[in-house]
């Protein structure tokens, strides 16, 4: 889901986000920086998206987006969410209700909210 729908949507709509005054699109995942770099290259994000790892879940736990997927062999992961930050202040934070979903946090849906 992430590589097929979620991330590509933000790459596709990057210019529209810029038109709305969004300075940076950052993708945060519970992975190390090497995985994030490879994932970014595989999805041709270029300089459109900052790929940021949260391997120890520090940020993910701080915002309450951690989910236990141990039953699926994945351990503690991050739920999908979108966050709009302005001057270091969170303006909007929307988290998916279903961890397998990509509706609320989809690029086209979030674009309409900023």
Predicted regions, residues:
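Chalcogenol-based redox active-site neighborhoods
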Residues: 1-114
């Amino acid at each position: 889901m992430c590589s097929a729908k979620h991330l590509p949507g933000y790459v596709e709509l990057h210019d529209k986000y810029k038109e709305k005054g969004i300075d940076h699109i950052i993708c945060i995942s519970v992975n190390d920086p090497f995985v994030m770099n490879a994932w970014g290259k595989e999805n041709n994000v270029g300089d459109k998206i900052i790929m940021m790892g949260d391997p120890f879940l520090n940020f993910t736990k701080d915002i309450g987006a951690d989910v236990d997927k141990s039953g699926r062999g994945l351990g503690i992961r991050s739920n999908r969410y979108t966050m709009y930050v302005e001057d270091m202040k969170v303006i909007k934070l929307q988290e998916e209700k279903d961890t397998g979903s990509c509706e609320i946090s989809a690029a086209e849906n979030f674009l309409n909210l900023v």
